[in-house]
Every structure is written in C-alpha cells, then in structure tokens.
A protein has these predicted regions:
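Short, glycine-/small-residue-rich phosphate/pyrophosphate-handling segment
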Residues: 69-113, 117-131
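N-terminal beta1-alpha1-beta2 submodule of the flavodoxin-like/Rossmannoid cofactor-binding fold
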Residues: 1-66, 121-167
Length: 167
C-alpha cells in the first residue's frame, strides 16, 4: 500500500486484548479511524475461524465506531498453517458489510499460509494476493478521495428497517 503512495499504520490488538486492554485499544483505534481512509483487518486462524481476540475487539470497535466506518473501504486477511482461512475472512467481512463499507478484494481469497512469518513469505501465491490487495486498496482509497474532490456525493442513506422474525 505504501508503495502506491498511501500511508499505513498497524495496530496490533491481539496481545493487548489478552492483557485486558480491550477498552484502551478500541478507543485508540476509534480515535485513529476518524482520519483513516480505509482499514485492513487480519487474523490468524485458530480452530478454523478468526481468533477470539480479534472478534472481541471488532465487536466492541464496531459497536462504538461503526457509524464512523461507513463508506470507508475495508478488507480482511487471514493467515493459517492449513485450513480455516475462508471462514475467517467471512467472519471478518461481516463487520464491513453491516456498516456499509466497500469490501476490497484481490485475485484470490485474501489468505496466506505458513506456521511462521518465514514460512508465510515463501507462500508465493499468498504474497502475490497480498500485493494485489494492497494495490486495490490504494486505488479505491485514492478513487474515493478523487471523487470527493470532484463533488461526487455519497449515496443517500435510509433509516434502518429492523424485522423481528418472531412477531
């Protein structure tokens, strides 16, 4: 993403959630997202799904700051030794979709395989997928910025209709 001229910042939440700092990291991320143009959320795969730490963080984060995320591009990435990556991406993408965020993709599912960082960089297909994801994210962020500068208005919203299945 940075090679495309877009500034990035990494917030590592997993270890902080385990230390009981979930409220602090949610507030920190919420403060930063006000000026961010997009987000990429990543998770290792544990038991064929996203880590509990990232899910706890996202539940709290989007509960507090979901409205601030509207129309900001989002993408999910997953890393695993073997299986569970697509279900992890599905879990993470739901936060973007329910908050009206464009979901950025690549030329394959946004996954890498490896048990260590050294193994992951040897996953040539996965690394290509990540490079293309970065280019696509940078392109969409720049495109949205250009549209704003040209006066293109955001879509008109609607009040949320909620349906209970039991009446």
């Amino acid at each position: 993403i940075e090679s495309e001229g877009v500034e990035t910042e990494i917030i590592n939440v997993g270890s902080r959630v385990l230390k009981g700092e979930v409220d602090e990291v949610v507030k920190e991320a919420g403060d930063k997202v006000k000026t961010a143009d997009g987000v990429i959320v990543g998770s290792p795969v544990y038991y064929a799904s996203a880590s509990g730490e990232i899910m706890m963080f996202l539940d709290r984060f989007f509960g507090a700051f979901g409205a601030d995320m509207k129309y900001k591009p989002g993408s999910a990435v997953a890393s695993a030794r073997r299986g569970g990556t697509t279900s992890t991406i599905d879990d993470l993408n739901k936060y973007f979709q329910i908050n009206q965020m464009p979901v950025v993709s690549s030329n394959y599912w946004n996954i890498v395989h490896g048990n260590t960082p050294e193994e992951v960089v040897r996953d040539e297909e996965g690394m290509q997928t990540m490079r293309l994801l970065g280019k696509n994210m940078a392109w969409l962020v720049k495109s949205i910025d250009a549209a704003k500068k040209q006066g293109v208005e955001l879509p008109c919203g609607e009040d949320k209709i909620k349906t209970n299945f039991i009446r």
